Amino acid sequence: MNKFLKRLCLIILLLIIVYIIYLYTFYDYNFYSSIIETPIPMFTKIEEKDTHGGFHGDGEALVKVYFSDKQAEKFIRKIDKNIHWNKLPMKDILQTCLNNNITDEISVPIIENGYWFFLDRHSKATNKYNYYDMFGRASSNYSIAIFDIDSNVLYIYSLDT
């Protein structure tokens, strides 16, 4: 019985270690995939700039995801099936929000060819895809994603105030 308990504890410990490694390795992919409602391929290069951490976690973040040509083709097929992704150009009001909030450290280049996605993450959002609803509130929590098909780069910008 004692030998059985030792083996059981060892197995449980190994499972916990494997789970922690999994979370550490794949958390970003799953988190950003949930924001844009489209799976990001594993093992793509991800760069992050984040100014969150102020009062109540206020700040902005920009994530750049670099795709290979093959990954980009698959990703485009997936966003074509998602009705909340739209072809560029982006609505002027969203482009203004993007340009007015981005700092020198966090910037998105002007993109001519690609797709865009908006998600209102505010707790009072009635339609999380309707960007007009966010203007009547004292705070904003939203994400804008832009996929550049010329350079195969996905930009995910998030603002929390």
Language model regions located:
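Intrinsically disordered, low-complexity regions enriched in Ser/Pro/Gly/Gln/His and often acidic
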Residues: I12-L15, R77-K78, V108-I110
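N-terminal export/targeting and maturation segments
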Residues: V18-D92
